[in-house]
Amino acid sequence: PQGTMSHYMTYSGLLMLVICTAVARLLFGSRNRIWPALVMPALVVALSLTLSRNAWIGACAAVGLLFLLKDFRLAWLLPVILAVLVVIAPEGFVNRLTSTFNAQDPSNQDRFAMIEIGAKMVRDHPLVGVGPNMVPRLYEQYRPDYAINKVNPHLHNVPLQIAAERGLPALAIWIWLIASLTTSLFRLFRRQPDKILSATALAAVVAMLAAGLFEYNFGDSEFLMLFLVLVTLLVALPIYAAVARSEEHTSELQSP
């Protein structure tokens, strides 16, 4: 299933971020928790049906973080929930899940090949990379014999893709950006009494990073737009509220 998206991985990435939002509302919200409770089962089923392992990993990492942020004693819930899902899940889901740990799985073999290809590209072009959108064009030049696919559109790994396309300095800047963002969000989480938005943003970052080790989600425009909304909403809302108050005050002064 891919919903209304062009690819099932885009769809699963968006579902992963929505799950972050719903779980954060359930754990940290004091009101309006009915709708996330109602949609959570549908979100979990929809994400499971995509058979997208990177999104499963990202969602689990994000939910685990939210449990820890709420109360570290809740961390034991995650393996219990996963165990229940595995028990009640259909055979196709279980097979897809267990294939994650099978080094002989064709999909996994191709991922190993992509890591090798990306490393060679970085070795040959460490400063500026091979250039934006050039990875698929040069793929066959670096492709090892054991690779499954003749060409892949990207390397299915965010840090590796950035380094291969744009060089190690660009990767360093990206790491600095994510580290600064995470530090700022955690600081806001500790300071603010209403923690829903900051918890959602932190979960979105962790989900992106965990899933991004197996998928180039940072280069997916639909995923990136929702991700950026979630991580900046915490800062944008107070600014919007201040502007609204200022406009309201100006309107009152101008009224006869």
Per-region residue spans from a language model:
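A membrane-periplasm/extracellular boundary helix in multi-pass inner-membrane enzymes
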Residues: 50, 67-108, 113-124, 132, ...
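Membrane-interface micro-motifs in multi-pass membrane enzymes
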Residues: 2-15, 163-167, 218-227
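Short "domain-exit" segments at the C-terminal end of structured domains
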Residues: 252-256
